[in-house]
Amino acid sequence: GKPMLWHLINRLRQTSGIDEISVAKSILKENDVIENFCKSEKLFCYRGSEEDVLTRTLESLEAHDADVGVIVYGDNPLVDPVVVDEVIDFYKVNREYDWVGNDLLTTFPAGMEVEVFNIGALLDSSNRETDPSIREHGTLHIRQNPNTYSLWNIEAEGVRRRPDLHLGVDVGEDLEVVRMIMKHFSNGAVFRLEDIIEYLDRNPQLPLRNRNVHRRWRKYRQSL
């Protein structure tokens, strides 16, 4: 099969709101294979600090002269391009916000995280934040300071409101679940979050495989 990153990039290419895709990885030797993959896919790959993700993100965006950044995480190969565009579209219409995303409060399934933000706000957060454990999480300083920055969280509605599901890949159990989903939808048709949820609800044993995994990111987020 194709690498996880290929599936993610393929889904991001179905969005209408993203102008350019940049893969931001660290300078560690183990990421050379990702840089080579990016070259084969004609993608821009920025290599920066391993620990300081805030600086790496900022430099990657500055290399494109971007004024707005969109973050989608590399371990979320099932992210829905429609969800990505919804967050981008909300930001475009509501420019008074420094940051718009769907992960301040977890209402979507994990693995659907999208953040859109003003580069000026990210630069400001970089100038203010000195704690390496905060800088390691990119936009975390912005998300933790609602009195400094104007934030908006987009909540999932209807069938998409499933914070109990985990569609990202943190551990081996997650990879099993994601592979089963991809295998089910391997006929090449574009599949959306609603389709994934319907499939998991018809196969309830599958989401149980990774339901009880300890998630480090939960301490940085509110959950319902």
Task: Map each language-model feature to its residues.
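Conserved donor nucleotide-binding strand/loop of the catalytic core
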Residues: 39-51, 62
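Acidic donor-binding/catalytic loop of UDP-sugar-dependent glycosyltransferases
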Residues: 53-59, 74-90
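Conserved alpha/beta core of the MobA/IspD/sugar-nucleotide pyrophosphorylase nucleotidyltransferase superfamily
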Residues: 138-224
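Acidic helix N-cap motif at the loop->helix transition within catalytic regions
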Residues: 30-39
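Conserved donor-nucleotide/metal-binding helix-loop-beta segment in metal-dependent transferases, i.e.
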Residues: 80-107
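N-terminal glycine-rich phosphate-binding loop and ensuing alpha1 helix
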Residues: 1-25, 30
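Conserved nucleotide-sugar donor-binding
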Residues: 66, 114-126, 172-176
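Short aromatic/hydrophobic "clamp" motif used to bind/position activated sugar donors
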Residues: 69-70
